[in-house]
Amino acid sequence: MRIKSMAKSELPRERLIHNGAKSLSNSELLAILINTGRHGFSSLDIANELLISFNGLKELKHLSINDLTTIKGIGLYKAVILKAAFELGERMYARDFNEKIKITSPSDVSNIMMSKMKDLTQEHFVVLLLNSKNIVIKEETIYKGTLNSSVIHPREVFKAAIRASSNAIIVLHNHPSGDVTPSKEDIETTIRLKECGELLGIQVLDHIIIGDQKYASLVEEGYFDLRN
């Protein structure tokens, strides 16, 4: 439907004002950001085209300015507004470790890291550094790319922990496929890191795999009881 043919009360801006943002669809919220259309097409049409072209809302945060401007009706100015809005959305869900977040279970880790890691297109190996009370003091990305047991060196993992005077760590990585089943390499990496941690006096509390809205804890699955 063209925006010009809508009753004023049905326009996205009016509906947001009177009914709240939750009453709007993804395309209507995008239309507000896009603001104006192009010849023969409304901002709502352009918003729908954007969603269809890039396979839905969750992919939009990965788009570059150049990607956004491939949609007719989205020039540099509009692309900058959209990119800024996507980044603000990400930052709103990013946890500030000054909040003194205490880890008591794998689900606590998932609550902190899921929004950051579930949509990453490359594998990331991340370490949460904890103090003696299991409060997160820092998050550090150790590696980006294709992970296997040979590229994750304990030296790099524990160097970060020693530098931060961390008493314990939790390691995480994501599976871009969304499947959180631990691979052989995941298990080998877990065992090696746990054994190195025991020698250094820095406890490895868990290895968590992040997928598409789900996670696997290698502690919960029993892999921390294994030895070579």
Curated annotation (Swiss-Prot):
CDD domains: MPN_DUF2466. SUPFAM superfamilies: JAB1/MPN domain, RuvA domain 2-like. Residues 102-224 form the MPN domain. Gene3D superfamilies: Cytidine Deaminase, domain 2 (3.40.140.10). GO terms for biological process: proteolysis. GO terms for molecular function: metal ion binding; metallopeptidase activity. A motif (JAMM motif) lies at residues 173-186. Zn(2+) binds at H173, H175, D186. Keywords: Hydrolase, Metal-binding, Metalloprotease, Protease, Zinc. InterPro entries: MPN, RadC_JAB, RuvA_2-like, UPF0758, UPF0758_CS, UPF0758_N. It comes from the Bacteria. NCBIfam families: PRK00024.1 (NF000642), radc (TIGR00608). Belongs to the UPF0758 family. This is UPF0758 protein SH1266. It comes from Staphylococcus haemolyticus (strain JCSC1435).
